[in-house]
């Protein structure tokens, strides 16, 4: 009987610590989701502003090219649809989000297009990406259970970003800017989706459907 009473304070302390860790985890998830939502909105606005500088025919042509082309970050294996996203583990979604954010650390520093909004926001974007990367890394450490059940393909090397647009034609500068902004918007939407699903799972909500 005495042993039971001795164990009770230990169990209570353990319970409080677990509850505190869960609350801190949710706080970090809230911050991460808010930051990527802001990045996604910025990406959407910059893309729309850039499209507004193009002629209608030019915009349609670039859109057709982009649909047939691919983003540098497409080398990162990620869920292909909502169903696969929902089936993915929290840890896998966090790792993919980390890789996607990491893939934009260098390109975000080279977004020097004629659009004054882009120039003004380039440093701010780099800082926000860096902060988000640190936050996701903390979430990964807090979610690890000692076993990473990720495929080898999830860790494949990204191609050098500097060579990604080297084969563009004479209108390469406009096309490069269009693809950079379109890919950035696309990837921020992906990360927002993955972090939102992961946050929902960690909060034990009944419905985490997209």
UniProtKB/Swiss-Prot annotation:
GO terms (BP aspect)? animal organ development; calcium ion homeostasis; growth hormone receptor signaling pathway; hyperosmotic salinity response; magnesium ion homeostasis; positive regulation of growth; positive regulation of phagocytosis; positive regulation of receptor signaling pathway via JAK-STAT
Q: Where does Zn(2+) bind?
A: 38, 192
Signal peptide (residue range): 1-22
Keywords noted in UniProt: Disulfide bond, Hormone, Metal-binding, Secreted, Signal, Zinc
Q: Name one GO molecular function term.
A: growth hormone activity
Q: Which cysteines are joined by disulfide bonds?
A: 71-183, 200-208
Among PROSITE patterns, the record links this protein to:
SOMATOTROPIN_1, SOMATOTROPIN_2
Tell where it localizes: Secreted
GO CC annotation: extracellular space
| Sequence similarity | Belongs to the somatotropin/prolactin family.
Which PANTHER family does the entry link to? SOMATOTROPIN (PTHR11417:SF2), SOMATOTROPIN,PROLACTIN (PTHR11417)
* Its job: Growth hormone plays an important role in growth control and is involved in the regulation of several anabolic processes. Implicated as an osmoregulatory substance important for seawater adaptation.
In its UniProt entry, what is this protein called?
A: Somatotropin
């Amino acid at each position: 009987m005495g042993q039971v009473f001795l164990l009770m304070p230990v169990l209570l302390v353990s319970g409080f610590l677990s509850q505190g860790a869960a609350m801190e985890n949710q706080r970090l998830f809230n911050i991460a989701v808010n930051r990527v939502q802001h990045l996604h909105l910025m990406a959407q606005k910059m893309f729309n502003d850039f499209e507004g500088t193009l002629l209608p025919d030019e915009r349609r042509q670039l859109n057709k090219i982009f649909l047939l082309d691919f983003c540098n970050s497409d080398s990162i294996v990620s869920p292909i649809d909502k169903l696969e996203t929902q089936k993915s583990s929290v840890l896998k979604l966090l790792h993919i989000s980390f890789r996607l954010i990491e893939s934009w650390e260098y390109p975000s520093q080279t977004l020097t297009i004629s659009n004054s909004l882009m120039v003004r926001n380039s440093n701010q974007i780099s800082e926000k990406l860096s902060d988000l990367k640190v936050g996701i890394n903390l979430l990964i450490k807090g979610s690890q259970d000692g076993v990473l059940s990720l495929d080898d393909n999830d860790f494949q090397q990204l191609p050098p970003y500097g060579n990604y647009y080297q084969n563009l034609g004479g209108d390469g500068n406009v096309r490069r800017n269009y693809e950079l902004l379109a890919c950035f918007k696309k990837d921020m939407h992906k990360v927002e989706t993955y972090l939102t699903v992961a946050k929902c799972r960690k909060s034990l909500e009944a419905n985490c459907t997209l």
